[in-house]
C-alpha cells in the first residue's frame, strides 16, 4: 500500500508495504479500510488529507489489480504490432535519467515501485526516449 510521497533515502517511509499480505489474502482491502477509518475516528492527530490519500491509493491498487485480473490478456496484447525491443538500459537502470534509474533500482532492490514511478514511465514511453 502506498502514499503519494516518495523519499529516496527511505523507501518505506511513506509506504505501509502491506501488498504482500493483501495479495496472499492474509488481510482484505475491507479490513484495511475499516482499520484506517477506525484509527482516524479515534485520533486527534491524523490529518484527513493523509487518510484520504491512503484510502485513494488502496482503491487505486484494487482497481489496477482488478484490471490485471480480468483483462490481462487484452493488456498484454501487442495491439499496434510493434516489433522494436527496448534497450538493455531499461533492464539495468542505466538510462541516465535519474528518476527512471531510481525507479528501476527500487523495483529490483525492494520489489516495489510506487505509482509515481509508473507515471514517469508512461511519460517517457509516450515521448519515446
From Swiss-Prot:
InterPro entries for this protein: Crypto/Photolyase_FAD-like_sf, UV-DNA_repair_photolyase
Keywords annotated in UniProt: Membrane, Transmembrane, Transmembrane helix
Lineage: superkingdom: Viruses
Membrane topology category: Single-pass membrane protein
Cross-referenced SUPFAM superfamilies: Cryptochrome/photolyase FAD-binding domain
CC terms in the record's Gene Ontology section: membrane
Sequence intervals crossing the membrane: 103-125
Gene3D superfamilies assigned: 1.25.40.80
Keyword Acyltransferase among UniProt keywords: no
Subcellular location: Membrane
Coiled coil start-end: none
Protein name, entry field: Uncharacterized protein R853
Amino acid at each position: 500500500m502506498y502514499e503519494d510521497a516518495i523519499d529516496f533515502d527511505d523507501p518505506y517511509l511513506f509506504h505501509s508495504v502491506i501488498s504482500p499480505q493483501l495479495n496472499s489474502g492474509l488481510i482484505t482491502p475491507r479490513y484495511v479500510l475499516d482499520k484506517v477509518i477506525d484509527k482516524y475516528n479515534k485520533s486527534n492527530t491524523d490529518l484527513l488529507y493523509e487518510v484520504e490519500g491512503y484510502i485513494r491509493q488502496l482503491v487505486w491498487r484494487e482497481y489496477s489489480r482488478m484490471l490485471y485480473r480480468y483483462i490481462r490478456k487484452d493488456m498484454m496484447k501487442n495491439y499496434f504490432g510493434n516489433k522494436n525491443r527496448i534497450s538493455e538500459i531499461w533492464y539495468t537502470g542505466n538510462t541516465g535519467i535519474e528518476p527512471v534509474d531510481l525507479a528501476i533500482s527500487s523495483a529490483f532492490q525492494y520489489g516495489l515501485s510506487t505509482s509515481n514511478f509508473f507515471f514517469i514511465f508512461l511519460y517517457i514511453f509516450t515521448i519515446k526516449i
